Regions:
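Terminal (often C-terminal
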Residues: 1-53, 59-66
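Terminal beta-strand-rich extracellular "head" domains
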Residues: 57-115, 119-123
């Protein structure tokens, strides 16, 4: 599945990035509602687990009127940011865009579900 959000968003601290468009639909193991920041991964498999590769890439900046400082994002599983996916960018000025990306493999046990998101974890 590929989901995108091409319009500029202001994402508050501890809030999720919202994905507005489903470019490529997944299968019944991946569920997303356009406009939501949550994606549900379901362990629909005949094996003991279903493995998913989750990746994120995006351009980030400090909005006009903001204070220059580090911006931190992370892929979150069930609302908890995964430390190894932390993406940090420190623009020199407001409205200076920089690119960040991260990826993670997730194992979802058979019959279980997990929700993933990309969260602003800046202080």
């Amino acid at each position: 599945m590929e989901i995108t959000a091409n319009a500029i968003q202001t994402v508050n601290e501890n809030a999720n990035i919202l994905f507005t468009d489903t470019v490529v639909c997944g299968n019944c193991s991946i569920m997303h509602r356009d406009g939501s920041g949550l994606v549900t991964l379901r362990g629909l498999t005949n094996q003991c687990r279903a493995r998913f590769r989750v990746s994120f890439g995006g351009n980030i900046a400090i909005p006009t009127g903001g204070t220059v400082g580090p911006i931190s994002l992370a892929i979150a599983v069930n609302g908890e940011p995964v430390a190894t996916t932390t993406m940090i960018s420190t623009p020199a000025a407001v409205e200076e865009y920089q690119n960040v990306s991260s990826a993670i493999f997730l194992d979802i046990p058979k019959g279980c579900c997990s929700q993933i998101s990309v969260r602003n974890i800046s202080d």
